[in-house]
């Protein structure tokens, strides 16, 4: 496959892991994750608000593991995002799924989700503050390689992952799954490789937005791969989506 030659080793693994046609939801597939995966909640404070992110890793080596940070859908840090983190840990990564809203808050309806997500779209720098706060927690873990960090995100999280790629220069790669593409931030660097996995039938990502994104990436000379999957709608990686 030509696209695989364009990707870093980290992105290749993430491509197979999260773009495969897996019919089981991670939170319902504990048998697919080995018993050697350890999980824990990591709590910290950002500007007076408590956050409760989720880490997963295998304690099977003295060598620090490359890190993958997971930005959840707009529902918050649900079992789906935690399940993805556990699967990544099973693959040999140190995974951190980010609590984006604080206090581990989750919602189950679009109205509440929209209210929580809206500030990050209106003021994108808010997302950078939350991301940096979560990223700093990695330093607490000697088994995590702070110099090798990649980011993946789903839907809302995919949009925020792309924002991090536009603003960060030290990330090893960013993958967006069915996320919005244009969020008001222009690339400040072109050092981070990007993989976008988009559903061709996703009504939330129109052709005009795709064209604008590609133009922005090309103008900034960003190294990116855009996969547009036929007959795929929004949230196509989540079997529990409706």
Could you say what each language-model-derived stretch is?
Residues 15-18:
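C-terminal motif of bacterial Sec signal peptides marking the signal peptidase cleavage site
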Residues 20-22:
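Bacterial signal peptide processing site
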Residues 24-35, 41-141, 238-242:
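Serine-hydrolase catalytic machinery in alpha/beta-hydrolase-like enzymes
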Residues 84, 206-216, 226-229:
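Short alpha-helix in the alpha/beta-hydrolase fold that links the catalytic acid
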Residues 131-191:
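Primarily recognizes the serine-hydrolase "nucleophile elbow" in alpha/beta-hydrolase
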Residues 196-198:
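Short beta-strand/loop motif that positions the catalytic acidic residue
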Residues 201-205, 234:
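Acidic catalytic loop of the alpha/beta-hydrolase fold
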Residues 220-242:
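C-terminal catalytic histidine-bearing segment of alpha/beta-hydrolase fold enzymes
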